[in-house]
């Protein structure tokens, strides 16, 4: 088995993700593989900035979510043609959970290391879900 790890700049945009999927496709013809992807470029930084901003101003944190959401929806639009609604619904659900965390930070006026870790995990949850769906579509041979 081969493990392939792709960092943030490797999955920063749809063109780079297409290159990653081509590498995955080629590698999977040789052996079984596991793929690990980071959050899309700068997403983790933006998520953490949003959490820190939520301490002071929830509206700024909400704007940061919208900026991150826009990038993710653009990538979905460029990579996924089938079951798009399901992908949008799941991604929206993740963003709604993130917003709830930001609102909790604002209301409690508390941002622990545990909460920061939880917030930063959303980048990988989002990117891995989107890339997995793009791969399913690309590699579907039926």
Give short role names for the model-derived ranges.
Residues 1-142:
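Nucleotide/pyrophosphate-binding catalytic subdomain
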